[in-house]
Amino acid sequence: MNNEQNMTQNIDQTTQTAAEQATAAQTAAEQKLAKKKLTRRIFIGGSLGALAVVGGGAGWAYNRYLAEHTEIEDTTAYEAAAQQANASASGSTTADPTELTGVKVNGQSLTANEGSITITSTTTGSGSDAVVSFVADIKLDNATLLRSAFANNKFGQNIIDTPSNIASEHNGIWAINGDYYGFRTTGIVIRNGVVYRDSGAREGLAFYRDGSVKLYDETATNAQTLVNEGVWNTLSFGPALVKDSAVVDGIDSVEVDTNFGNHSIQGNQPRTGVGVLGTNHLVFIVV
């Protein structure tokens, strides 16, 4: 994916939050902005959603798909220690910026000294056929202002929460759900420049410290190499819809997640996408 002026979109194939939850989370965020009860951070969520279990083997299914399995109890402390170690290894003495300053709100738009956020919404159809989409156009001076946070500040499997709660707990001014890492045991998971999982399995999306964003093959690299190359966050999801300003060949025949624990989400289901318009210029959509 070209990071200059080329749109690349990835769609979260495992978003399980209901449409009304996504709408409610976005509405709550807008209300907070309108009241100017502002916090200062922008977040991509960790593990979000509701799981459905069907069929027999209830004990096994509960343990695999519902029971929490915590690998890291305090991700904030874990990241602080890892970032300090990385800084010592690289000899860097410059801290990454983490907060917006000089925040001003006008309707659904926000401006700050370090960038801007503009939110728009569109409704098509009516009644039970109504589809609501929210689009956030985000411009930042520094890519590290876009941070990740985990549900309950833990890393593991089946640890869930809503985007609004995660944002509130981490002083987020805007938030969106992430790649649903917690349902899987595979994928490369890098958050805020720190490695959490290194088990390449699929196509991923890498957000770099320099503001560029690239699609990549997880099986052709490893997490530490990506961090050394300047990756700040990764999303292990897909499929890619647009690459180098063109629709990806065969996208209309790609089957989206159909496994036992995570029921099929083919057809009309809540979706989350991200697009890249240029360096440090991103667009996020929730439908």
Which residues does each predicted region cover?
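Generic structural motif
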Residues: I138-A143, D210, D244-A246, T279
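Short, solvent-exposed aromatic-acidic interface loops
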Residues: A151-F155, A220-A223, V287
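Active-site-adjacent helix-turn-beta-strand microarchitecture at beta-sheet edges
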Residues: Y181-N259, H263-I265
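Short coil/turn connectors at secondary-structure junctions
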Residues: H170-N171, A201-R202, D210, S236-F237, ...
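N-terminal targeting leaders characterized by basic, low-complexity, disordered sequences
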Residues: M1-A28
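Structural recognition of the beta-strand scaffold that forms the well-ordered cores
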Residues: I173-N177, A206, G275, V283-I285
